[in-house]
């Protein structure tokens, strides 16, 4: 399967390194806003083709799957371009800036009979099944609460600090905390409350409380100006689970009701962690599927809708590029 990368920034580098270490997929083409930038990227990371415009790459019939690596403010516009050009799409999180854009893309993909999926890597990683299996075993009893945080000192990064790039902590890192809670507690959400500290028009530190059916709750924090331990805790009636780094789990530890460690699990070695979403796309395409089981379209729309509601409660409106 030949991969085309749309955009040549930092996250594109990670995907290029990932694909270079995989079997049955190929770093084939990269497109940037200038040919010189694309050519330099292609030479450094071993791509066969470099294009100085997105349209040129999308016209290449050899491209099987496009990975969108641009700021999420432009995901809708770029994903739409890909679909209209007949390309399958793996779009970096946050998938779009709102649920309405996500619905439009999924409808277009269905019309074009193409695969499109959100590249939120934690949904595809082996650690997800490891956590599910621990919970299913009953060792921690009935799960009633989740606490998670994800904060990075990235407030000066352009995509974070600029409202016109859909900046702020929520869409960039908060999406991981909401997905972490959702993977554990499900989709039967009753209420969401959130507060934030804003700087220059974007949210820099957010706290989110989510209440689910069955009297279960998630308490989440995300931020773009401080460092946190990135921990996730899953609390049950007989014990609890601690996940070291919810953004790329490094260790999963199980404790009993006496706070004694009873088991610890290490996720398998990986290239970067991005390989799992690429593998999921390859499987789905080979099987004629139009979405990945790991991140169904309905779930992307649901999570985007949660974030829409949070921003609405803050009065934060994001410019749309459509």
What do these predicted regions represent?
Residues 1-45:
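N-terminal Rossmann-like dinucleotide-binding module
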Residues 15, 48-106:
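Beta-loop-alpha module in the N-terminal Rossmann-like domain of NAD(P)-dependent dehydrogenases
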Residues 51, 91, 116-118, 243:
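Hydrophobic residues in well-ordered beta-strands that form the structural core
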Residues 65-67, 213, 280-322:
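C-terminal helix-rich "cap/oligomerization" subdomain common to oxidoreductases
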Residues 103-121, 141-146:
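Rossmann-fold dehydrogenase core element
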Residues 122-193, 198:
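Predominantly a Rossmann-like dinucleotide-binding segment in NAD(P)-dependent oxidoreductases
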Residues 179-251, 268, 280-287, 321:
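Contiguous beta-strand/loop segments that form the cofactor/metal-binding neighborhood of enzyme cores
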Residues 265-279, 295:
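Active-site loop of classical SDR/Rossmann-like NAD(P)-dependent oxidoreductases
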